[in-house]
Amino acid sequence: MITVSCIGFLTGVGLNGSGFAMGVQSTSARDARVGVPRAMVSRSALCALSATEAVREATRHHRSGGNGFVIVTPTGVQVVETSAAIDDVTEERPWGAHTNHYISNKFQTVANSAAESVQRLEEAVATLGGVSDRELMERARFLVQSPGFVPRSPDRSVVTAFVMLADLGAGSVQTAPGGGERGPWVRVNLP
């Protein structure tokens, strides 16, 4: 699994000791409400005892807003999208990806979505398919450095981002700076 995130928003990104990895991005919808904050929902999903339980945690009612989750197990990937009131969960499949804009048509009535972001996601998925881990790591870092891939503040300053590659078989996570930064990949093994 590869995930790209901004430093400081890492509550639900990582490798779980129960054998799954998860990436998450906030989504924007018009049905936001008072409820459990998205960061707490994503953290609860990452701390679940299984990928199935992570899906349940991600889709619990009483959410204040939504996220796009990518939950990866050794057998496949599920994409889970939520708004405050709506959720959509894909069947397990070999590949999955998400951006901070809704992909599922189920959210058309509430989404504040941008087609350009979804198009970049589809291009990234096509680019990353069928490559070695090393090539995948370099391509992921390159994608993060691509114009328009990393979100920017209104004054157009660069947001610090990182790339994470989770290897479920080895029980490890490798991470490196993205967003124009160069640096070594650092590997962390689960105990």
Placement of each model-derived feature along the sequence:
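Short amphipathic C-terminal alpha-helix that caps PH/PH-like domains
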Residues: 39-45
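A contiguous strand-loop segment
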Residues: 1-38, 52, 64-66
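C-terminus-biased signal that marks the final domain/tail of proteins
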Residues: 45-191
